[in-house]
């Protein structure tokens, strides 16, 4: 998290976590953390990448608590890994986020097999011990 955006409350623990994960996974683009306003089902976060900047939208309850738990660590590893995938051009979404292109192969929202999600889940376990605060 290179720059600060005022979201109405302080998240110093999460800021430290994002910085640490970014270093551990080799993520070099700026990342903003923003409240997730439109939550669907059990969605706790999602990532976007545009104009060389990653934005991770996180469930507001998690941000307000600013508490680092194993779940929160894995959530941020997962979402920051998606930022890395997008910054490297391996994962690209169309403007409406209805079609994803993963390493040259197109997938729609109807596809249940999403290799970028499988990879991000693996990274949660791979990097958890290195990131644990």
Across the structure, where does each feature detected by a protein language model lie?
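Auxiliary, metal-adjacent structural segments of Zn-dependent hydrolase domains
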Residues: 1-52
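Generic recognition of long tandem-repeat/solenoid scaffolds
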Residues: 3-4, 56-58, 65, 100-102
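Active-site scaffold of zinc-dependent metalloenzymes
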Residues: 36-70, 86-87
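Post-HEXXH active-site segment of zinc metalloproteases
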Residues: 70, 74, 86-118
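Short active-site segment of divalent metal-dependent hydrolases/proteases
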Residues: 77-85
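A generic secondary-structure boundary signal that marks alpha-helix termini
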Residues: 85-86, 129
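Short, conserved alpha-helix that lines the donor NDP-sugar binding/gating region
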Residues: 121
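Short helix/loop segments within enzyme catalytic domains
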Residues: 124-133
């Amino acid at each position: 998290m290179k720059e600060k955006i005022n979201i109405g409350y302080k998240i110093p623990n999460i800021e430290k976590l994002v910085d640490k994960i970014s270093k551990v996974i080799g993520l070099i683009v700026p990342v903003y953390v923003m409240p997730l306003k439109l939550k669907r089902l059990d969605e706790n976060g999602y990532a976007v990448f545009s104009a060389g900047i990653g934005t991770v939208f996180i469930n507001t309850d998690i941000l307000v608590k600013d508490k680092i738990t194993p779940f929160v660590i894995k959530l941020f590893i997962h979402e920051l890994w998606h930022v890395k995938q997008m910054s490297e051009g391996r994962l690209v979404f169309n403007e409406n986020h209805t079609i994803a292109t993963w390493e040259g192969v197109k997938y729609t929202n109807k596809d249940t097999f999403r290799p970028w999600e499988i990879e991000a889940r693996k990274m949660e376990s791979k990097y958890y011990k290195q990131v644990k605060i």
